[in-house]
Amino acid sequence: TVDEVADMCLDLQQQGALNVNFVTPTHYSPHIRAAVAHARARGLALPVVWNTSGYETVRAVRDNVGTVDVYLTDFKYCSSSLARRYSAAPDYPEVAMAALEEMARCVGAPEGDEVDGQPRLTRGVVVRHLMLPGALEDSKRVVRTIWERFGNDVLLSLMNQYTPVLADA
């Protein structure tokens, strides 16, 4: 229930968590917004992180204003053919970029603080990009596109841990 999620948020804070991180949460958005509002009314002071694939509507991002402090979003491809091949979503680059632009507009440039010597992001956007084998040029294009559109107003996390495992191996 909304009350139970609010209680969980407050429990995380009491346990010393640095943030409340909702993973792939879009389909629960109205309930999460209500739970966070309820928890904040009861003293929640932790940043709220929205951990998403990036395939969000602009409306969904706008609806989260006042709830989400940090977006942790993927930006998987600039290539619609890669998006079609790996995600069955040839419109992913356009949809994800529109959502990313709105995320940056809604939460602003990165801000942070320190808790017990640990740095913590309190506001902003972190864009994750998983570098795929055989798609280096698209990864370069992703980095260039993010930099040209946002500069230092978003943080970029490049990941290269993808390891294809063959069925015969």
Predicted regions and their residues:
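Conserved AdoMet/S-adenosylmethionine-binding subsite of the radical SAM
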Residues: 3-168
